[in-house]
């Protein structure tokens, strides 16, 4: 393959079943790619066969089943990518820079055997396979760097936060996963759809009062396929749900006892204002300022700019301009209509609730609630700071300023909670970028290189 004018030779080992007791042989497989130079005792950019980090990208979108990635020409991942030029995907770029690439497929919500926590268990099993076989294959399994977008970004985050945690052990044993650890070296996550049990509140904290929406067609949740926006206006019943959800978020934020870099506690008052809101808007200001400093024009009716400096961000106006994409509740639908409802189903029931709020307001007769343990095992925030989890030191999180798939607050909480527990977090909101991933591969691999050679 040719990357940036350079021909890349590599060996491909595809369709490797990474568990002994495979439940879904179509998805519980891994593709491994190794630069050819490593078989000739060569080195690439300072890496050798023994010490090359392992790049571990997943292709999961919408918590759907996903096959492993292959090195190929592709468009960036996301809804705005149909018109983008095809270029080498992350796996291909990784090979050109000397990384061993291992990409695992995983089960997903549309199958009875792919409900929570199947996808994260599969990714952990794949990591264990790499660790167990470290001595007999190129690449350093103590330097696994995961990467994913949207639900894949959530699972990349969860893989990092929950390393070696005993919660998953019974599931891994049942699959016949290798007897090895599953902690990883670093996490890259684009627009992670996490903290699902609080994401409905977060969405209304940001979008309450924005009553027109453009909703993504539910059949198009997998970000590898074309998505369709359907316009509409909230009903009175939906507005009432939004009004109930918004004031629930401050109590949750205040319960986390988050602190900024100066040690100040991040809080919200009963109206949703406060230091946490300022913390979130600070990242929007930072993104705009970078554009201004680079000499680019910044047009946004929610920004105040004086003498080339951003002086204020109006989050309510930002929400109006960005536009609502989901109807309340955004994730746990009272009619059990969301992809996340299907994620939290089980072998007997395709769709279930996973918040008390939606359960109490359910419009579906006989609706049931997912188990507390399954809900816990899908949220990285539940494992950050848990002494039973081995968490990586290094994290890179990116969410575009045009992303409306979840509240900006969600990724901000992840970033600051990680920092509060000693992690180094590179967190930013790239200007004008929608819900998408792998759009800044030069920067991603520069970050990975710096970590890997420390």
Language-model regions, residue ranges each:
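Short beta-strand element of the alpha/beta-hydrolase
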Residues: 30, 44-63, 67-74, 145
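Mobile cap/lid helix-loop segments that gate and shape the active-site cleft of serine hydrolases
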Residues: 22-27, 32, 162-173, 180-181, ...
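C-terminal catalytic histidine-bearing segment of alpha/beta-hydrolase fold enzymes
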Residues: 199-205, 239-306, 396-403, 410-415, ...
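Primarily recognizes the serine-hydrolase "nucleophile elbow" in alpha/beta-hydrolase
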Residues: 132-210, 375-376
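Catalytic-loop region of hydrolases
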Residues: 1-48
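A fold-wide structural signal in alpha/beta-hydrolase
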Residues: 54, 92-107, 145
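Alpha/beta-hydrolase active-site loop
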Residues: 114-136, 446
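Short amphipathic alpha-helix adjacent to the substrate-entry channel of hydrolases
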Residues: 71-101, 173-174
């Amino acid at each position: 393959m040719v990357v940036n004018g350079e021909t890349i030779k590599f060996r491909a080992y595809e369709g490797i079943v990474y568990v002994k007791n495979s439940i879904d042989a179509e998805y519980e497989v891994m593709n491994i790619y190794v630069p050819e130079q490593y078989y000739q005792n060569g080195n690439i950019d300072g890496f050798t066969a023994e010490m090359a980090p392992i790049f571990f990208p997943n292709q999961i979108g919408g918590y759907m089943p996903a096959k492993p990635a292959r090195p190929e020409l592709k468009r960036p991942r996301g809804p705005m990518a149909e018109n983008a030029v095809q270029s080498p995907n992350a796996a291909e770029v990784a090979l050109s820079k000397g990384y061993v690439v291992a990409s695992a497929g995983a089960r997903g919500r549309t199958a009875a055997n792919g409900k929570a926590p199947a996808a994260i268990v599969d990714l952990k099993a794949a990591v264990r396979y790499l660790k167990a076989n470290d001595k007999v294959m190129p690449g350093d399994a103590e330097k696994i760097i995961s990467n994913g977008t949207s639900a894949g970004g959530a699972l990349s985050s969860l893989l990092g936060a929950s390393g070696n945690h005993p919660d998953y052990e019974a599931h891994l044993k049942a699959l016949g996963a290798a007897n090895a650890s599953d902690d990883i070296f670093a996490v890259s996550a684009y627009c992670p759809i996490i903290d699902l049990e609080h994401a409905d509140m977060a969405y209304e904290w940001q979008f309450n009062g924005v009553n027109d929406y453009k909703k993504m067609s539910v059949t198009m949740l997998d970000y590898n396929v074309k998505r369709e926006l359907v316009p509409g206006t909230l009903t009175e019943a939906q507005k009432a749900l939004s009004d109930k959800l918004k004031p629930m978020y401050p109590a949750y934020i205040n319960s986390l006892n988050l602190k900024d870099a100066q040690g100040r506690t991040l809080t919200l008052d009963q109206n949703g204002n406060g230091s946490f809101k300022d913390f979130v808007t600070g990242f929007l200001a930072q993104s705009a300022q970078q554009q201004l400093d680079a000499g680019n024009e910044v047009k946004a009716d929610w920004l105040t700019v004086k003498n080339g400096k951003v002086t204020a961000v109006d989050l309510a106006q930002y929400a109006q301009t960005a536009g609502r994409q989901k109807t309340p509740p955004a994730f746990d639908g009272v009619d059990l209509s969301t992809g996340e409802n299907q994620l939290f189903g089980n072998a007997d029931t395709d769709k279930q609730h996973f918040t008390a709020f939606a359960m109490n307001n359910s419009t579906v007769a006989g609706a049931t609630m997912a188990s507390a343990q399954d809900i816990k095992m899908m949220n990285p925030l539940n494992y950050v700071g848990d002494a039973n989890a081995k968490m990586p030191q290094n994290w890179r999180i990116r969410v575009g300023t045009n992303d409306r798939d979840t509240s900006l607050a969600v990724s901000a909480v992840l970033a600051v909670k990680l920092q509060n527990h000693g992690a180094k977090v590179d967190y930013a909101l790239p200007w004008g970028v929608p819900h998408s991933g792998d759009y800044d591969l030069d920067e991603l691999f520069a970050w990975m290189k710096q970590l890997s050679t420390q």
